[in-house]
């Protein structure tokens, strides 16, 4: 077989084995154009993204909770004010920023006697005032006849807000105990001289300030005489001698029930002066001290003569007579 014949045979065999694609290609080219089928988009799950956002919210909430908790713990432990309650017992209360008692300290032996049976830590101001007033009443330091309490707050440690809250708490406690309330309340500025005097006299700085205000305005009442008196007697003396308190609020009035009635004392004074009620054209009375004892001093006039008669406020004995 010649080369030409061999090549022709090979071409024939290749054509026979190769599929005829031309007709199919031609048919596709001649057919109308079709829109490609839109591919279906499968959304990716958002679990990962949501899980990340949830974690961030949890973290933020935890930070907020810790901040609030930390602030709350700070407010419960850090002193927010120091106040003293005086009747004759003198009790110092340190309170936190939420108005709860952190500690109670006795400033004199009478106060220690009162505090021995009390647990005031973590109590509210109202509860502490209720318990202190009730204990003072039980122990005889407060009663319907001796009803005055002095509230003193150190300046810069609670100031007027604490003073007002504690004064209101004491007023409420006295009412609950069946007393007519009598509360003196003050904010005390830092005064080194006053603190030295208070320490030497064995009294609170608040009581020392009350004594100073009385002795400064009433010539015949000295600090040495006043220092041993309970708060109720100081309150009586201040009111009777028209003391104008500076920086001190007053609620109610001091009771004089522990002393003889006015009419009884007046009758003793009239008899000692040789007068009758009809003879008197002018009369006045004030409480004062003679030898450290409370007396009722009557100034009487019959139009011709003037008398000053001092009657012991407890025994009704005449202590002094001039005129």
Segments from the language model and where they lie:
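Disordered, charged N-terminal biogenesis/targeting segments of membrane/secreted proteins
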Residues: 1-48
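Short, positively charged
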Residues: 44-47, 66-71, 287-295
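Polar, acidic low-complexity tracts enriched in Ser/Thr/Gln/Glu with frequent Gly/Pro and Thr-Pro motifs
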Residues: 74-323
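Extended, compositionally biased low-complexity polar/Lys-Gly-rich tracts
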Residues: 9-16, 53-56, 299
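Alpha-helical structural elements
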Residues: 17, 49-52, 69, 282, ...
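Single-pass transmembrane signal-anchor helices and their membrane-water interface zones
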Residues: 21-33, 54-81
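Short hydrophobic short-linear motifs embedded
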Residues: 39-57, 64-65
């Amino acid at each position: 077989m010649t080369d030409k014949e061999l090549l022709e045979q090979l071409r024939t065999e290749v054509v026979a084995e190769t599929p005829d694609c031309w007709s199919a290609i031609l048919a596709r080219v001649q057919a109308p154009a079709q829109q490609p089928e839109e591919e279906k988009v499968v959304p990716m799950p958002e679990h990962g993204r949501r899980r990340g956002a949830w974690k961030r919210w949890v973290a933020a909430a935890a930070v907020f909770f810790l901040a609030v908790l930390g602030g709350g713990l700070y407010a419960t432990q850090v002193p927010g004010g120091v106040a003293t309650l005086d009747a004759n017992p003198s009790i110092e209360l340190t309170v936190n920023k939420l108005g709860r008692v952190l500690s109670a300290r006795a400033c004199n032996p009478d106060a220690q006697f009162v505090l021995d049976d009390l647990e005031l830590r973590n109590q509210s101001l109202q509860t502490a005032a209720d318990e202190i007033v009730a204990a003072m009443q039980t122990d005889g330091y407060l009663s319907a006849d001796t009803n005055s309490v002095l509230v003193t707050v150190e300046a810069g440690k609670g100031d007027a807000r604490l003073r007002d809250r504690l004064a209101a708490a004491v007023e409420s406690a006295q009412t609950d105990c069946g007393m007519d309330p009598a509360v003196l309340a003050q904010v005390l500025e830092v005064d080194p001289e006053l603190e030295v005097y208070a320490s030497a006299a064995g009294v609170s700085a608040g009581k020392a300030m009350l004594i100073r205000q009385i002795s400064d305005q009433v010539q015949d009442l000295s600090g040495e005489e006043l220092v041993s008196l309970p708060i109720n007697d100081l309150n009586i003396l201040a009111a009777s001698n028209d003391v104008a308190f500076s920086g001190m609020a007053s609620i109610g009035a001091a009771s004089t029930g522990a002393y003889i009635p006015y009419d009884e004392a007046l009758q003793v004074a009239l008899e000692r002066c040789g007068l009758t009620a009809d003879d008197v054209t002018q009369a006045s009375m004030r409480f004062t001290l003679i030898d450290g004892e409370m007396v009722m001093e009557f100034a009487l006039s019959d139009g011709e003569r003037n008398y000053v008669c001092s009657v012991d406020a407890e025994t009704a004995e005449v202590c002094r007579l001039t005129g």
